[in-house]
């Protein structure tokens, strides 16, 4: 038996890649300096994996922004709008991810979507009529050669052709089948070049195989691989799957002339059953047995019990998915040992994979004994009062009265807002000064009184600016918050916070998910102080800003000893108490963000309701069910595909919902219209994840497109998402255009 991982975190132990790349974006360092720093980081990571005793080391799992974008770039899947710009390869690459606005042109970034059921976001490739698929990139070869210079023969990794097609957009009437032959040829060219460089095996990531597959999709997969595998150019091929099981394609998959197949034994409900039914003796099974998505220690006894049932002769132990979904290492954390011993970040998961391999080979008795002792000890007690409160919930606790239509009329009279009311999603730019003041306060270098004074000044400044520009519903800006989940978690029992537990979310943005350690209750009011202060500074309504229970759960590392449903209901009751306190303090518009609602939606449609939506949607309703009819409840969702769960979203019974929409070309509007969506909506009118400022007239056209699909009385005008990560100049310029466009659109309604 040997060991490997599917992939390793990219940002670095201390987010070195993030800070270096941001310097490049600010033109503080050259492209050569960025590339040199990235090369140094890769070498460091390979060395860590090697020193941990992992026998097969992957390469090309590193990315300057996103691995799906890397694959698109490798195969020349670059939209004509970007291909025509006179830019360097690196500039063109980042233009696809971030947009480009300069002397050489003005192009929007490609859309961004959640990567399956994770909080990682990928850039969506675009296939057009003009797309000529061919081998165009060189990153995969350069990184293999780099590792070889260090004495390492790595296993190159690239997104497989089926998944590349499945996660892409197609325009101009083209379809995935149109690119099968060209993709097969291009992948074979990759095989040939890697074999020439000395590679032995390539990993083709095909997570799309774990979803529901139609007959057409199965045929596409088999056609691709029949052509692709007709000539492997002397290279061994591993088809690697993750995030679930491959029940729809298993019988075909095991008959393909591949050398190895990677299966997920953590999230794959039927993986063990499939393998026990037979696995080819001439293939190697890469068994994903260590959870790549959560931070809890692996229970060796349970993992070994699974491994003992696998009939395959040739097994490589691996992670269930890439380790980019967990933090780098626990070595920099300050938890007491009794807590820290329960956690395994990426580096520690290497130890776990090696331990399991050693135990299987009769050499890991000490590691097994220590692991047994860890799991034999009760980790945390339960809150009996909270458990009783949840047990006592009835249907009435999940139902808001009066019904939506009656509330809508009451709120229209209460707020007297103009047509197409304008607002933002919540946060304003967090400047260096804001971050420095927060850090100084945390370190005790700034008094609470001085910090509060600073925050009040920030709120005053932005409330005044919003009034001057002409916004209808204001926000306080969230200057007191570092992260929309961590901020709440710090005021909830049962939560722990890592010091350096950063995980890549999109591009160079990292998030630091808190850890749900025990039962969750609210310790004290969380947002009332600054929301009520902001409301006192203006006659216009100011939104109270909360993070919803499902998003708090999905953006945390959840417990594994109780169900995520039970954890979510605990959080929902805590946020419900906060909602009622805000309402009592005079805050009459309350936004409860559910940005991550889609994130843990099962990948198979048959599991959507029973396993998730049947409790996730009621958990949201529980939060706001007892507010007064003249209190308006907003929610916000971003960067996921929502079109197929529109009825469930309407069933959340919010009064207003804002969606990410501009970057995905307002695709959601047709579905809202088709499903007769009742909730008032704010489809984002410009993309905040790109630094470019919308052109004059751009937002006007977007509003026009929205009004063609949604009745004007149902429409709100807002950006795609919060503005925390943007700069002040671009933010103000964009928001001024937003308000001007809304005012112009109102004139056309008259």
From Swiss-Prot:
Residues binding Zn(2+), per UniProt: 636, 638, 660, 721
Catalyzed reactions: 5-methyltetrahydropteroyltri-L-glutamate + L-homocysteine = tetrahydropteroyltri-L-glutamate + L-methionine
Residue pairs linked by disulfide bridges in the UniProt entry: none
Cofactors (names): Zn(2+)
Active site, UniProt feature: 689
Entry keyword Transferase: yes
Pathway(s) the chain acts in: Amino-acid biosynthesis; L-methionine biosynthesis via de novo pathway; L-methionine from L-homocysteine (MetE route): step 1/1
Top EC class for this record: transferase
Tagged with keyword Metal-binding: yes
Pfam families: Meth_synt_1, Meth_synt_2
Binding site for L-homocysteine: 425-427, 478, 593
Record keywords: Amino-acid biosynthesis, Metal-binding, Methionine biosynthesis, Methyltransferase, Repeat, Transferase, Zinc
Matching HAMAP family: Meth_synth
Function: Catalyzes the transfer of a methyl group from 5-methyltetrahydrofolate to homocysteine resulting in methionine formation.
The protein's name in its UniProt record: 5-methyltetrahydropteroyltriglutamate--homocysteine methyltransferase
Organism annotation: Streptococcus gordonii (strain Challis / ATCC 35105 / BCRC 15272 / CH1 / DL1 / V288)
């Amino acid at each position: 038996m040997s060991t490997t991982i599917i992939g390793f975190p990219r940002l670095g132990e201390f987010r070195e890649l993030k800070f270096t790349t941001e310097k490049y974006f600010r033109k503080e360092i050259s492209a050569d300096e960025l590339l040199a720093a990235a090369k140094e980081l890769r070498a460091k990571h390979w060395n860590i994996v090697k020193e941990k005793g992992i026998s097969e080391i992957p390469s090309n799992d590193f990315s300057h922004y996103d691995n799906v974008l890397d694959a698109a770039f490798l195969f020349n899947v670059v939209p004509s709008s970007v291909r025509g710009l006179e830019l360097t390869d690196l500039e063109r690459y980042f233009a696809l991810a971030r947009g480009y606005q300069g002397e050489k042109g003005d192009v929007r970034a490609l859309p961004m979507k959640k990567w399956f059921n994770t909080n990682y976001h990928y850039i969506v490739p675009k296939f057009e009529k003009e797309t000529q698929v061919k081998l165009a990139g060189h990153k995969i070869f350069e990184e293999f050669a780099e590792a070889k210079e260090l004495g390492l023969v790595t296993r190159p990794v690239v997104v497989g052709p089926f998944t590349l097609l499945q996660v892409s957009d197609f325009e101009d009437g083209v379809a995935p089948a149109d690119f099968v032959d060209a993709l097969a040829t291009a992948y074979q060219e990759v095989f040939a070049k890697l074999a020439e460089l000395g590679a032995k095996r390539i990993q083709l990531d095909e997570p799309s195989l774990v979803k529901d597959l139609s007959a057409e999709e199965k045929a596409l997969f088999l056609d691709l691989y029949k052509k692709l595998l007709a000539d492997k150019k002397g290279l061994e091929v591993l088809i690697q799957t993750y995030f679930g099981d491959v029940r729809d394609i298993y019988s075909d998959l095991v008959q393909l002339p591949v050398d190895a197949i990677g299966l997920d034994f953590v999230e794959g409900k039927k993986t063990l059953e499939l393998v026990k039914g037979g696995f080819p003796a001439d293939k190697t099974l890469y068994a994903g047995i260590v959870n790549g998505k959560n931070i809890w220690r692996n229970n060796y006894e349970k993992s070994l019990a699974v491994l003992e049932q696998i009939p395959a002769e040739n097994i490589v132990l691996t992670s269930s998915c890439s380790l980019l979904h967990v933090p780098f290492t626990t070595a920099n954390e300050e938890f007491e040992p009794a807590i820290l011993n329960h956690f395994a970040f990426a580096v520690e998961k290497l130890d776990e994979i090696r331990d399991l391999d050693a135990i299987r080979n009769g050499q890991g008795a000490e590691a097994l004994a220590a692991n047994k002792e860890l799991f034999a000890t009760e980790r945390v007690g339960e809150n009996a009062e909270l458990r009783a409160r949840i047990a006592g919930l009835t249907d009435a606790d999940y139902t808001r009265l009066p019904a939506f239509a009656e509330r809508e009329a009451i709120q229209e009279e209460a707020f007297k807002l103009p047509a197409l009311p304008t607002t933002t999603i919540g946060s304003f730019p967090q400047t260096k000064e804001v971050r420095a003041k927060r850090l100084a306060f945390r370190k005790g270098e700034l008094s609470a009184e001085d910090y509060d004074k600073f925050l009040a000044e920030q709120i005053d400044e932005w409330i005044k600016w919003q009034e001057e520009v002409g916004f209808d519903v204001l926000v306080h800006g969230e200057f007191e918050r570092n992260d929309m989940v961590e901020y709440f978690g710090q005021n909830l029992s049962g939560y722990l916070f890592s010091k350096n537990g950063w995980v890549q979310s999109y591009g160079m943005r990292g998030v630091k998910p808190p850890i749900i350690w025990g039962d969750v209750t609210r310790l004290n009011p969380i947002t009332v102080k600054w929301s009520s202060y902001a409301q006192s500074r203006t006659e216009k309504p100011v939104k109270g800003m909360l993070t919803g229970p499902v998003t708090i759960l999905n953006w945390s590392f959840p417990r594994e000893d109780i169900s995520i449903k039970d954890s979510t209901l605990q959080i929902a009751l805590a946020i419900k108490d906060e909602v009622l306190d805000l309402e009592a303090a005079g805050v009459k518009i309350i936004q409860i963000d559910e940005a991550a609602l889609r994130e843990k939606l099962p990948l198979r449609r048959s599991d959507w309701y029973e396993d998730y939506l049947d409790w996730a949607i009621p958990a949201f309703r529980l939060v706001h069910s007892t507010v007064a009819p003249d209190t308006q409840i907003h929610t916000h969702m971003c960067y996921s595909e929502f079109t197929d769960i529109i009825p469930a979203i309407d069933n959340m019974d919010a009064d207003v919902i804002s969606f990410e929409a501009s970057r995905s070309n307002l695709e959601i509007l047709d579905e809202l219209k088709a499903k007769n969506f009742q909730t008032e909506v704010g489809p984002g009118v410009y993309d905040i994840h790109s630094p470019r400022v919308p052109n004059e007239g751009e937002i006007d056209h977007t509003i026009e497109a929205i009004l063609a699909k949604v009745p004007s009385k149902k429409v709100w005008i807002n950006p795609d998402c919060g503005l925390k990560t943007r700069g002040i100049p671009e933010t103000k310029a964009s928001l001024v255009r937003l308000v001007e466009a809304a005012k112009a659109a109102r004139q056309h309604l008259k």
